[in-house]
Each structure stands twice: as structure tokens, then as C-alpha cells.
């Protein structure tokens, strides 16, 4: 399926009309999240890397024009103005891994209007999904308080490619590994895994299964101990570890039941057998809330595997993300509707100490000591720097997380920082609003 035709129909009809009307001036669009979902104190910017790949390859080919014509049930000649359209614009963006807040642009596109319009849907689809999942995974990292996390989400994500990206996003915020082989290969993430209950069930006994697995995979192994009776499974695993002289690097996995109580009993059995170095790994419907509860109760769990709820960002599976025109042909524009008003002009986010962020105009000088977050990552349709890596994004995330106020880091009832608006952006917003209301009477209509 062509990435060009992976779009909403109205992007095509608008772009065609722009071309017919010779509206090819440069347009600036801003992509941002209006409000944070409940239970979120921050977001993690993600999706920029695949977005830049998409833009660098974007070109409307003959087959795309034919598909558009067939969809609209119009002669292919009517859609001919779209043929050959490619992206040669500029992109400024917040790098992946940076923590961002509501109302702050994650990405701004400046390009001829038809181009900038046609890429809207694909960009929103990428950044909305990936920022939501990265933000969920980041909260798991907070909850784990330094304990390793492994991504187990592939089988429950919204499609195979979503699972590959979920693994990348988990690595981006500090997960130690993934069960996803494709993601491990593509992004250089450590692969990790144990066994399924089916493996144990296929053998005549649990012990036979454990011994066979250890024979097949010399070295450290992790044994799933809850297929039948967890306490007996732990005892069997301990016996196998002792008999085969396994220990350092090995582990047992608990996947059901009262994980805290089971872990405490398992630790007692393992330590009593002289297996203090055998790790306990917990899984089974966990996300930041479950991990936080287990950590707070002091459960002797060494690592956590999280899947379904993280790979789908289950409690906040979407973001109120928008991509809005803020300038056309040098003229700042804005939307006035009361619930979804926008601010005009290309913007920059200036980060001061303690996440005292200010959203201002792109050409403003930063306030003293503040760091501009958006940087130019594409010019003339070409990347300005080499592709980013999950490791580099992880370093940025860890720096931002360390500086994030404690109330925003809370798992329960977090309080996000609220960015300020610069005086110059406030003044421009007032001016543009007045011009629109004078021209259209919108203010009088709303007031009346």
C-alpha cells in the first residue's frame, strides 16, 4: 500500500483545489497536543524518525494519481496536477525522547501549501500513536524505580508493525529489552524471552520440560513456573537449577496470581536452596500501576515484563493531537472556535529550569537561560543530520526525566507543568484575532 494514498480523502481534495487555484505559497503547520489525557503528567515526543523517513520519500506517482481518481470516481486527467508532487519543505521538531507538555508544538512543517496539506494525516497517525505509547512506557520506567523492564507487547498490539514500533518506543525510554525479534534486529535492541505455558504442557511433567529447555539452551535460562501450581513450580525450578549447576543469570517467571505474595515465597525457596542469584521476573497484565504497587509493597521482584497495556497505551490510547495552519504566504492565521482556538505563527518552545516552559514565536530570542526545544531537522526535503538512534533518544529522555518536577512524575494523580505564553505571541494572537473579527464579524456573533 502506498504511503501517499494512506491519507484522508479531504487532504486530496483540498490539495487539488489549492493547485487549481494556484495557491502554492509557503504554509506553516503546527502539530501539538491540546490537552494531556487523564493520568498523565507529561508526554514523551516520539514518531519523528519514521515521520522524516516518510517525508523524505513522499512523491505522488502515477499509480497514486490513478488511485485518487478511482476513489473520487473522476477522470484521471482531473487529478493530473497532483502527479509528481514531492515534499521539499522544512521541518522543525522536538527530538525524540524529549519530554513535552500540552499546547507545545512537537513538530512544525513549512512547505508549499499543497505539500504541507497532503502530509497531515500520515504525520498525525505516526506521532499520535508513538507519543502515546512512549509516554505510557515512560511511566512504567518511573514505577519500576531502576528495575529492568522488558517489552512483551507484540501479540496484543494493534497490528504487527505497531508491535515493532512499540518495542522501539520502549527502548527509547529505557526498557532493557524486547521479546520482538524483528524490533531487536531492526533497532539493535536486546532480545529477551522465557517460554510459554504451551511448552510446559507439551511435556509429560513440568520438570521434564524445564530440563529439556535447559539442555536446548545452554547457559542462563528463565523458567515459567505457574503452569500448574506456582509454589511447586518454583521448587521444581530450584531443583533443576541445582542439579544442572545453573544459577547466575537464570530466572523464574511469575505470570499470574498474587505476584507479590508468590514472589516472596519464591525468594524464600530459592535462597534456601543457595540460589540467591536466580532472578524473579513478573509479568501478566502489568503496567505502571501494577508495577508501582508491587514496588511499594516491597515485592522481591528483580525485573518486570509488560505487554498489552503498554503496547496499546490502554488507559490513554489516543491523544488530542492536531495539525493546524498557523501561517500562509507570510500571513499569520488562527482558528477562533472557543473550544479549539489556535495561536498564530510558527513557534518555539523555550525550556527554563524546572520545566518552566514558554511557548513563543519561532524568531524570538530565548529568555535568559532557556533552551529552544524545536530544531531544524529537514530542509529542502532533506534531513539536516543523520538518523537518530533509540540510545540517543534515551539519553535525552533520562536528562529530561531527572529535571521533571516530582508532582508530574507521580503515578497516581500527577500534576503536569503548564507552559507560559510569551508576550510577543500573546500580542500577535490578539492582533490576528482582532483582524479576523473585524473582517468576519466572528467576535460579534460569538458575543451575541
Predicted regions and their residues:
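Ordered alpha/beta subdomains of enzyme catalytic regions
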Residues: 1-219, 246, 323-448
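Glycine-rich phosphate/ribose-binding loops and adjacent secondary-structure elements
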Residues: 198-357
Amino acid at each position: 500500500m502506498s504511503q501517499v494514498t494512506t491519507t484522508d480523502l479531504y487532504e486530496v481534495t483540498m490539495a487539488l483545489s489549492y493547485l487549481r487555484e494556484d495557491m502554492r505559497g509557503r504554509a506553516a503547520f503546527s502539530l501539538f497536543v491540546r490537552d494531556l489525557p487523564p493520568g498523565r503528567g507529561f508526554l514523551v515526543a516520539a514518531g519523528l524518525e519514521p515521520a522524516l523517513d516518510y517525508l523524505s520519500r513522499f512523491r505522488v506517482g502515477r499509480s497514486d494519481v490513478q488511485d485518487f481518481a478511482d476513489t473520487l470516481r473522476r477522470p484521471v486527467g482531473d487529478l493530473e496536477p497532483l502527479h509528481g508532487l514531492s515534499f521539499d519543505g522544512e521541518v522543525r521538531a522536538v527530538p525524540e525522547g524529549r519530554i513535552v507538555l500540552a499546547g507545545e508544538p512537537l513538530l512544525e512543517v513549512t512547505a508549499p501549501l499543497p505539500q504541507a496539506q497532503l502530509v497531515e494525516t500520515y504525520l498525525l497517525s505516526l506521532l499520535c500513536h508513538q507519543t502515546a505509547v512512549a509516554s505510557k512506557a515512560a511511566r512504567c520506567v518511573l514505577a519500576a524505580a531502576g528495575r529492568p523492564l522488558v517489552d512483551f507487547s507484540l501479540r496484543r498490539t494493534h497490528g504487527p508493525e505497531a508491535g515493532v514500533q512499540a518495542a522501539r518506543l520502549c527502548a527509547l525510554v529505557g526498557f532493557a529489552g524486547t521479546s520482538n525479534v524483528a524490533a531487536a534486529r531492526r533497532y539493535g535492541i536486546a532480545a529477551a524471552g522465557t517460554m510459554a505455558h504451551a511448552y510446559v504442557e507439551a511435556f509429560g511433567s513440568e520438570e521434564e520440560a524445564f530440563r529439556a529447555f535447559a539442555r536446548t539452551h545452554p547457559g542462563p535460562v528463565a523458567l515459567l513456573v505457574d503452569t500448574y501450581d506456582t509454589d511447586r513450580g518454583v521448587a521444581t525450578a530450584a531443583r533443576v537449577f541445582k542439579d544442572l549447576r545453573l544459577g547466575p543469570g537464570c530466572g523464574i517467571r511469575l505470570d499470574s496470581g498474587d505476584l507479590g505474595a508468590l514472589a516472596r515465597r519464591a525468594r524464600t525457596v530459592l535462597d534456601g536452596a543457595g540460589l540467591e542469584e536466580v532472578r524473579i521476573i513478573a509479568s501478566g497484565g502489568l503496567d505502571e500501576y501494577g508495577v508501582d504497587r508491587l514496588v511499594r509493597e516491597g515485592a522481591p521482584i528483580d525485573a518486570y515484563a509488560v505487554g498489552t497495556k503498554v503496547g496499546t497505551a490502554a488507559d490513554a490510547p489516543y491523544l488530542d493531537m492536531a495539525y493546524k495552519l498557523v501561517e500562509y504566504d507570510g500571513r499569520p492565521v488562527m482558528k477562533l472556535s472557543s473550544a479549539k482556538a489556535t495561536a498564530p505563527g510558527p513557534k518555539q518552545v523555550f525550556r527554563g529550569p524546572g520545566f518552566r516552559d514558554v511557548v513563543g514565536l519561532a524568531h524570538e530570542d530565548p529568555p535568559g537561560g532557556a533552551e529552544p526545544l524545536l530544531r531544524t531537522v529537514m530542509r529542502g526535503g532533506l534531513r539536516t543530520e543523520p538518523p537518530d538512534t533509540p540510545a540517543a533518544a534515551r539519553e535525552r529522555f533520562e536528562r529530561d526525566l531527572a529535571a521533571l518536577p516530582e508532582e508530574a512524575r507521580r503515578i497516581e494523580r500527577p500534576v503536569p507543568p503548564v507552559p507560559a505564553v510569551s508576550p510577543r505571541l500573546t500580542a500577535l494572537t490578539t492582533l490576528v484575532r482582532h483582524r479576523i473579527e473585524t473582517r468576519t464579524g466572528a467576535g460579534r456573533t460569538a458575543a451575541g
